[in-house]
Amino acid sequence: MKNHFKCIGIVGHPRHPTALTTHEMLWRWLCSKGYEVLVEQQIAHELQLSNVKTGTLAEIGQQADLAVVVGGDGNMLGAARTLARYDINVIGINRGNLGFLTDLDPDNALQQLADVLEGHYIAEKRFLLEAQVCQQDCQKRISTAINEVVLHPGKVAHMIEFEVYIDEVFAFSQRSDGLIISTPTGSTAYSLSAGGPILTPSLDAITLVPMFPHTLSARPLVINGDSTIRLRFSHRCSDLEISCDSQIALPIQDGEDVLIRRCDYHLNLIHPKDYSYFNTLSTKLGWSKKLF
């Protein structure tokens, strides 16, 4: 049968011996099947692999057809922000807690992956957000997020006063502990815990979810995915930052705005053929069971 993928990258940042075991098992299995395999440098070092081709995440993105992320959702988010810049498919083997983005069961991963490698899979394009912290005539600080961009105090929790502009038109002002700007992918993450809506992954939409607002009128807002969001801050506000996927933080200085828009590139996320988004909601998040 024709191979749909020729070069496969193995990525992830293992924290437990069981995850490292999965990395090594996957490497040996792929090599035995005749695939060209690129192993992320840190993994190869920790496994003490010899005669193995290694690369950085960027090199894997440039050279491989498929990246297999071994770990939890945090590993997937960290790797996917880089891999999304390249024309590469990404799938995950769950070695974390929730595993909402890592579909493959570690106990049955090789059989599931064998089906995927033969072309039996579901492909999705997930968009990212780009966040810019900028001041007029100053250099921008930029990062991206798969799940969400969060405005919050830097160290000590306190109320923030800010205004929100959508496509440069004033939308609303708010006094709250922060704001979560989420993709459909991130709607089942931090946004959900703050009362935000669940968006199916194919929706072209962005959600704005207030964090502990100091008014009864503040509610989550869903806007078009093509929109550009600008956050402006009261001069009384200080020690603020935005975080991307709870992994990258950008401090906000006095006089700076934050711009958030959809990224120019997307993540090519693939799933096993029997994948169901609503089944994942049920099994991972306790979504309502069938009555009959």
From Swiss-Prot:
Keyword list, A-Z: ATP-binding, Cytoplasm, Kinase, NAD, NADP, Nucleotide-binding, Transferase
Record's subcellular location: Cytoplasm
Family membership: Belongs to the NAD kinase family.
Any single GO BP term: NAD metabolic process
Gene Ontology cellular component list: cytoplasm
Residues reported to bind NAD(+): 73-74, 147-148, 158, 175, 177, 188-193, 247
Protein name: NAD kinase
